[in-house]
Amino acid sequence: MLLGDWAAADEALTQAMDSEGLTDIEIIPCYHGWLAALRGDAGAAKSTLAALPKLRASEDPSDKALISVVEAFAAAARHHPESALRHARATLAHVGTLGISSDCPRWAWPLAARTAHDLGDTAAAGELLALLDDCPPGHLAPMLKAERDLIRARLAARDGDPGAATTLAAAVSGLRELSTPYHLAHGLLDHSTHLLRTGDDQAAHAAISEAGIIAQRLGCQPLVDRAETLQPTRSRTTPT
């Protein structure tokens, strides 16, 4: 999932679920439900979660964080941002035990930050940034450093900072080097939105195209849909 080979991840998880001796291990189908949610199949994610009674009843922080992060991405797939933010932050509530850079918090933080920004919830965005800023040196995964740079650049763009284009471009470069293809695609679309707003259509369309290619390769319908919402603006540069 981190490398962006979601087809291989799907195949490996499916084989594991069908393997003798692993059928009762609920963490495996839960990860499969997580992948379904990432791809936009909220129904499959919901069905998977409903079939995990032991995991849902567990008081283990790692189990609770896993359930919460799947619920967060499933809510995002259903276009329920308030619920997505709530569940993502529920995952982050276990940072003290699990560490901010463990799997679930490492994926939950970017979703929470993105959703808070999109909702205009500046208080939540500030609290999420503070969570990373307060981490001791060496505890923050490079991916999270890149995601923190992105949300700061998005906030600067929202506030009309004249240097926002530069900081957004730098943030995308950081994502390209340090994060996942999924998160890079979202960052490219963030950057393209700002570029379109400021009239740099050519650069925006290049970013949209790259994000769309990543989305198609991942089989990530929410990303495909997001890229396509920006497509009509291309008519402004289409030759007549």
Regions picked out by a protein language model, each given a short descriptive name:
Residues 1-239:
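Helix-coil-helix junctions within alpha-helical repeat/solenoid scaffolds
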